[in-house]
């Protein structure tokens, strides 16, 4: 095949994909990247951060991006990497937890909520972790009292806690403030999965924050050891650009393996070959948008979220919880059936595991007319 025929054939395949801007994707935490990402991607498409000595400029960019993310998360000494996404970030954190626990002769018992992302199930299988699942409160957050009591009863058996800041299904935030105190008091590690919430919570206007809800989640809390934060979600970076940040660079000692044939003799990330596109795009987009740009982006998404909730209630639908961020769960006892019927009309939503509900993520690509069209279709679907 010649080049033109190849491109023509590839366009046929690409035409079968949904496009974010069409407004039918309502269940994804990813969105259309910022337009500048296309130019940056072309500039950095051949870079490989797996061998940083060959790509010194891109490697410097990664350190700058980690520093920028650390600034958002209140840590000027953060250490970490831009990697493939939240799954790799969470696996990396759990790998560090396991190795630190082994060095202290502790069992690898980790408290992880039912609302945690399925990447922690992968970590459990891969690393033979023992997982404790605490009960959830009515707000779908971990029961802190249960955790405190459990650790007091079995102090030497718990090596770490995972808290969620913007859970995949509902957007709920565990009480990281209290979990941090527990971690400090008991000298155990605390990882915060803010893959989604990391680019939402710092920019959220007070008017959208629920009364009585604690939104603290980052390194301003002494007990937080590590945080997952994904630029390719609400950060508008192209896929794949996930982030793992640790409190300081001492954690590197528990991640490094020898890599004698590379330009740097040790490597800490799970994936060896890493494109520099995610790093460079994240750097450029963060520099372009700045704090004010992300505040505007988040608050526009929250305005649309509130519109969705208001209109849904007018149709007679109820939310499982009041939205904590731009994720909405609409109660539905026949969630799987409804989801499939909506898919026949090209609407792609998802379902919650921990509650009978449809899950909608109000990402920047969604417009008011998309939301209104979806709710009309949902209402018609439920009539039959």
Curated annotation (Swiss-Prot):
Its EC number is 4.1.1.11, 4.1.1.25. The gene is mfnA. Belongs to the group II decarboxylase family. MfnA subfamily. It comes from the Archaea. InterPro entries: GrpII_AminoAcid_Decarb, MfnA, PyrdxlP-dep_de-COase, PyrdxlP-dep_Trfase, PyrdxlP-dep_Trfase_major, PyrdxlP-dep_Trfase_small, Pyridoxal-P_BS. This is Probable L-tyrosine/L-aspartate decarboxylase. Its cofactor is pyridoxal 5'-phosphate. It catalyses: L-tyrosine + H(+) = tyramine + CO2; L-aspartate + H(+) = beta-alanine + CO2. Signal peptide: none annotated. Keywords: Decarboxylase, Lyase, Pyridoxal phosphate. PANTHER family: PTHR42735, SPHINGOSINE-1-PHOSPHATE LYASE 1. GO terms for biological process: carboxylic acid metabolic process; coenzyme A biosynthetic process; methanofuran biosynthetic process. Pfam families: Pyridoxal_deC.
């Amino acid at each position: 095949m010649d080049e033109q025929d190849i491109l023509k054939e590839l366009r046929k395949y690409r035409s079968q994909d949904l496009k974010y801007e069409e407004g039918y994707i309502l269940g994804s935490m990813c969105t259309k990247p910022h337009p500048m990402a296309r130019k940056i991607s072309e500039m950095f498409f051949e870079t490989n951060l797996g061998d940083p000595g060959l790509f010194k400029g891109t490697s410097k960019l990664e350190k700058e991006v980690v520093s920028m993310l650390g600034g958002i998360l209140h840590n000027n000494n953060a250490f970490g990497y831009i990697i493939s996404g939240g799954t790799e970030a969470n696996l990396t954190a759990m790998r560090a937890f396991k190795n630190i626990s082994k060095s202290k002769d502790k069992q690898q018992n980790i408290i992880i909520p039912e609302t945690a992302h399925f990447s922690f199930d992968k970590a459990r299988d891969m690393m033979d972790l023992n997982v404790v699942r605490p009960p959830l409160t009515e707000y779908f957050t971990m029961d802190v009292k249960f955790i405190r009591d459990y650790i007091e009863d079995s102090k030497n058996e718990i090596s770490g806690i995972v808290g969620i800041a913007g859970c995949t299904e509902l957007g709920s935030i565990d009480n990281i403030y209290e979990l941090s105190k527990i971690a400090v008091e008991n000298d155990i590690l605390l990882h915060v999965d803010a893959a989604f919430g990391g680019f939402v919570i710092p920019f959220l206007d007070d008017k959208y924050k629920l009364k009585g809800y604690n939104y603290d989640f980052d390194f301003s809390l002494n007990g937080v050891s590590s945080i997952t934060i994904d630029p390719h979600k609400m950060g508008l970076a192209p896929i794949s650009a996930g982030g793992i940040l640790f409190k300081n660079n001492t954690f590197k000692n528990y991640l490094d393996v020898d890599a004698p044939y590379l330009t740097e003799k040790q490597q800490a990330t799970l994936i060896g070959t890493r494109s520099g596109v995610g790093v460079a795009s994240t750097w450029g987009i963060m520099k372009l948008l700045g704090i004010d740009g992300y505040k505007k982006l988040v608050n526009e998404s929250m305005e649309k979220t509130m519109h969705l909730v208001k209109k849904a209630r007018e149709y007679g639908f109820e939310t499982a919880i009041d939205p904590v961020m731009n994720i909405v769960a609409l109660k539905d006892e026949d969630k799987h059936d409804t989801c499939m019927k909506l898919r026949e009309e090209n609407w792609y939503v998802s379902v919650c595991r921990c509650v009978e509900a449809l899950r909608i993520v109000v990402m920047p690509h969604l417009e008011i007319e998309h939301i209104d069209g979806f709710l009309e279709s949902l209402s018609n679907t439920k009539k039959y």
